[in-house]
Amino acid sequence: MEALVYTFLLIGTLGIIFFAIFFREPPRIVR
């Protein structure tokens, strides 16, 4: 069960960092 918790924390941290960088800079992807 600890592996699942560590994986969840890792994904959560990466997700927070990704959203922080994504919302800090204006999205340059034009569809």
From Swiss-Prot:
Pfam families: PsbT. InterPro entries: PSII_PsbT, PSII_PsbT_sf. Keywords: Chloroplast, Membrane, Photosynthesis, Photosystem II, Plastid, Thylakoid, Transmembrane, Transmembrane helix. SUPFAM superfamilies: Photosystem II reaction center protein T, PsbT. The chain crosses the membrane at residues 3-23. Its main location: plastid. GO terms for cellular component: chloroplast thylakoid membrane; photosystem II reaction center. It is found in: Plastid, Chloroplast thylakoid membrane. It is a single-pass membrane protein. It comes from the Eukaryota. One of its GO terms (biological process) is photosynthesis. PSII is composed of 1 copy each of membrane proteins PsbA, PsbB, PsbC, PsbD, PsbE, PsbF, PsbH, PsbI, PsbJ, PsbK, PsbL, PsbM, PsbT, PsbY, PsbZ, Psb30/Ycf12, at least 3 peripheral proteins of the oxygen-evolving complex and a large number of cofactors. It forms dimeric complexes. Belongs to the PsbT family. PANTHER family: PHOTOSYSTEM II REACTION CENTER PROTEIN T (PTHR36411:SF2), PTHR36411. Found at the monomer-monomer interface of the photosystem II (PS II) dimer, plays a role in assembly and dimerization of PSII. PSII is a light-driven water plastoquinone oxidoreductase, using light energy to abstract electrons from H(2)O, generating a proton gradient subsequently used for ATP formation. This is Photosystem II reaction center protein T. It comes from Stigeoclonium helveticum (Green alga).
